[in-house]
């Protein structure tokens, strides 16, 4: 199982010693140089709201993506080098900062600021929930108790409870695009990691989203969104497919579907060209 592998110290010892992983580690350490000194201050309102006044996405999203990158980089380095406290401490700082954000949704995805609901779920709210839930599952009691509490509380408030409310409508469930896979797979991961006993109640919604996503592909395995969004959507689909297979002891196995095999083969054929 994936979660058992990443919780096993022997796996990370292999990562440290196997030269195959060296390029990945070098990339992470290069990113760390920026993450180590990155500002954790609260995103100013004028920056977050700038999109609604100027249409400029860059200012607000720069803060957003810097935090997500720093969180992920710090988390992986904390697993590779558990004896280096600086990575772990930085990760917890960014976890807390992320939990303190007013919204996990990008401003460009918010219909308007007047009627906005902070627990709406877009691509990046779902991804953020997935990241925090997986950190919770992987690090477990290594996390400070308050950090664990904040993760669980915020993911429940922003992702799990809203999605479990069938009176709430999420348009992306019906999208035949990467949105259905990224949002659906990420939301499902939040349930599996933090509220496994509730996964069955939302599985019909997840199934609908994933089926709509798979229906967006041509017979060749190509999607009309292009190769970049093919990669984006299928990476999240694959993560969910592995997670739900582990969770159901193989009862749900998307990787056995011929269509999924065709989609995966399409990418390989493109890379061989």
Question: Where in the sequence are the language-model features?
Answer:
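Active-site lining segments of carbohydrate-active enzymes
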Residues: 113-228, 236-239
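Carbohydrate-active enzyme catalytic cores, enriched for enzymes
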Residues: 239-273
